[in-house]
Amino acid sequence: AIYGGASSPRVKRVAVSVPGAPKMKIALLSDSHLGLGVSLKRFDKAMNTLEAEKPDVLLVLGDVFEYGPHRRAYAERLAQADIPLGVYGVFGNHEYYVGYENSKQFFKDAGITLLENETAELPGGVQVAGVKDVRTARVSKKDVENLLAKTDKSRPLIYLSHTPLYAEEAASGGADLMFSGHTHNGQIFPFNYLVRLQFPRVYGLFDVDGMKFYITSGMFYWGVPLRFLAPAEIPVIEVNE
């Protein structure tokens, strides 16, 4: 089936088990590419869908806003979201393309705690580590290893990376969960084939040496407003539910 770019993203529920972690519902927002044909009305509808799931925390995986006159309005809609444990995120490649300082301001206005090779701690002790975009900011395997070496191995650890690379390093560094976007699950032909040449994992849930790794197809689209066998989604990760 072809899923047009005007289609609303579907909720994709994914259950994972993480020993020692509290019950938690995590919503993911990735690759919304706001401002490129995605109206504020459509984004508001998607956010209403996301909020209706009542997630404990929202994790933003980059490529959020592109260009357009309504940057502040999009940011304010995100900031209005009722997320008990907060909103944390990382930059994607497009945050660098549209301007680093502009993107930092958008994240700030949207109430997103930006993680740039940093770790934050959620209320309750769960750690969230995030890296700059692996390719655009030239993050190395060693950078990932150094970041995760500083985390508390006695507490659950979530690792965020826009680009779905270095999963093995994340797993060996103690991450229990890893979340990425970027691929759009190919979005349309022929990119669905080309993306598989670039990345060992493109979409869905994987087990990497015991670490659960989910790659999302993204909230909307980039470029052509069409999707082929790669519907847009709002992932809701149910931990130990």
Q: Could you say what each language-model-derived stretch is?
A:
Residues S17-E241:
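Soluble catalytic domains of enzymes that build or remodel membrane lipids, polysaccharides, and related
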Residues A1-K25:
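Acidic, histidine-bearing metal-coordination/catalytic regions of metal-dependent phosphoesterases
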